Structures are given as structure tokens and as C-alpha cells.
Amino acid sequence: SRAAEAVLFLIEVYCIMDGFFVVVACISLLCAITAVLRVRAIGWAVWLWFFVGWITGELAIWCIGLQVVFVAAWVLIAGTDTAGFSWGLSFFLATWVLLAVFLRDALDAGATFSRSLRMALGVGFLEEISLLRRAKITNQLHSKEWQWPFRFRRPGVRYVRNLPYTESGKRGLLDVYVPVAAGERRPVLLQVHGGAWMVGHKSQQAQPLLHRMVESGWVGVSINYRLAPRSAFPAQMVDVKKAITWVKDNIAEYGGDPNFIVVTGGSAGGHLSLLAGLTPNHADWQTGFEHSDTGVQGVLALYPVVDLTNRHGIRQQDSMDSFIAQRIIQQSREEAPAIYEDGSPISWIHRPGVAEVAPPMFIVQGTHDSLVWVEEVRRFVADLSPIAAAPLVYAELPRAQHAFESFHSPRTNHYLNAAGCWLEWVWARHQRGEQK
């Protein structure tokens, strides 16, 4: 009887292992589906869809590699003579096909960026950059970065941490990223983190971009700012204005040019960056420092929120109205219409003089962004581009999810190359005196 019990036990273990293989394969396939399929209006579940699709897609090479190792190890240990293995292998093969489609689009991002830059700036825009600075630009893909997607530090960068720019405790601090090589009057890149205006930290986002640009000779600044719901909007925008003022007053000590600042950010940070570019010296957001110049020389906005009011009805069933009213502005549109309007970048486009003084902009948006809908960003670009005095570059990336460039991946690599080209072009334009 003991022998029979042992046989039954082995059969149970075998069945469990067989089922485990199928379950892992099913989960892998579901994750791949979230990466390639655009799903948005599903309530709060959209956050889970975004997160799984984002991680799976941008780490697709790692996912495929680990799954291949898993299948190979299973074959060596458990064999292939089961129905469960056949089903599981079918699911894995489907997963790899979907991730291969995703990778194809990610690897094509370089061509998308190139077309967007040339359409907006001209075919020969790189020739406007000095030979010395052009040598810093690359269009190569660096596979070494994909091997370590979360390794950001570079030997040519030193850090000055936790400098206060306003009296808001830890939320009023910023970090300065400085090239190790000595220099002065370097271009400045000011990073504003995202996080739905409620979460986020100066050390968490845009690390690939900051390190790439600082290593090539820029000075980077990354800020904290007050968060909702403790601080209602527009406190976040006021802090961005204060940070710009701090940079203009202090960045020369770190080798930066106080007269040249490009502000960048993604999501809520992209929203604040666009507002910074469209509202220089807006008195309502500069109480106590009304006479400070808060103009910037460029805006690099990724998947930015462009409308707090859903004025065009694009979102339909997935309106942000309740979230904005309860958590961010903490007043309804009826109670505070001016705050909603002023807080919507799209509302500034047709105000007198705004399009004429807006700096060059580079807006990047993914078609499969679950949190910021591509149709809203398209509408913003379509409204501003024809009337803007300065060039507006818009790159729309197939299958790209929210926060796609947060760590190293093939698509992030293409983005860094394109951002470097554009930033150097804006800097060259400024040096020629073509913008204030």
C-alpha cells in the first residue's frame, strides 16, 4: 500500500507541475496581450492594465529570454510527453509572437522620431548645430543599456542633492546634475516629475535622459514639488515657477546658463512643463515673486495632460472630472472655473500673444497610452502647431505605453537619441540669437 501511495503522490506532483507550466504560460500570454492591445475605459482597472503592459512591453527582451530559459529548463526536468506541455508551449509561442510585434514597433521608433524632427525643423536641421556639439549626438542603439535597464549612473556625472528652492520642506528640494568636466554657461535641463500630481520624487523619473544629457555637457536639475491632496492645484505650478526662478538665480554656480532653460516632464510633469512654456510671468502663479522672469527656452513634454475639463468630450466614459475635482483642485468646475481653464494647457493656445511667445516644443505621445489619451494630445498639437511662432515637433509612437522611457529599452534608446538632437538644436538656435 505504501508503494501505491507513493505512486499516487508522484502522479499528483506530476499533475501539479503540469498545471503549473500551463498557468505560467497563460500568465505570460495575458501580460503580452496588455502590451500590444490598447485598452483604456475600464475604470480603476486601467492602472493595472497600464502597469502590466508597461513593464512587459518595455522589458520584452528580458521577458522572452526568461521564458525561453524557463521552457528549456522544464523540458530538461519534466520532459515534453504531456498534454499540459503542449498547451503551455502553444501559449508561450503566442506570447513570443506578440512580444516580437511589440519589439518591431519599438525598434522602428527611430524612424518615427526622425520623420517628426525633419518635418518640423527641416531636413538639414542637424547642420544648424555646431560641429563640436554635433559630435555629442548619436543615432546608435546601445544594447549594453538594455542589459541593465535600471542602471542609470554614469561616470561623467556628479550630484548635488537636496538644495532648497522654496520653503516646503522635503517637497521644496531639488537636485543638480553637473558634468564632472569643468565648464560654464552650459545649457540647463529642468525635470518635473509626474505622478498624477499626487506622488513622485525628483530621483525617480527621467533618469536616462538626465544622465545622457549631463554626460554630453548639459546641467540637469530635478525638482520635488508640493503634492495633492495636501496642496491643491495650482500649488504644483507655483512651485515649478519658483524652481525656474531659483535656476535663473543660482545655476551659474554650477556651470549652467541662467538664460537658457528647457523644462521637461512626463504625464503630470508634462502638463506642468507645457504650462511653464505657455505662461511665462503669469502673475496669478507668482504671488510674492511677480517680477521674476519665469520664461523658458524650450519644452520637452511626454504624454502630457493637456485638458483638465474634457472640453471636447474625447474621454467619454473615462472622464477625469471627479478625480480632478476631489483630489487635485478640490473644487468643482462650477466653483472654480478659472482654475480649471488656467490649468488646461489647451486653453492657453488662443489667448492673445501666447502662441507668438511660446518656445520650441517637442511632444511625445504613445498610441497605446492607457492614462493619457492620444486623441487629446493630437488635438492640442493640431490647435497649436499652425499658429505657433516657434517649431513644434510631435512624435506619436505606435504601441508605446505611459512612462515608456522610465528605464532603458530599445524605444527609450531611440527617444534619448531624438531628444538629444532636439535639445542640441534648441541650444544652437538660442546661441544664434533666434529666441529670447
Regions from the language model: what does each represent?
Residues 1-16:
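Short, Lys/Arg-enriched N-terminal segments with co-localized hydrophobic residues
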Residues 14-436:
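Alpha/beta-hydrolase superfamily serine-hydrolase fold, recognizing
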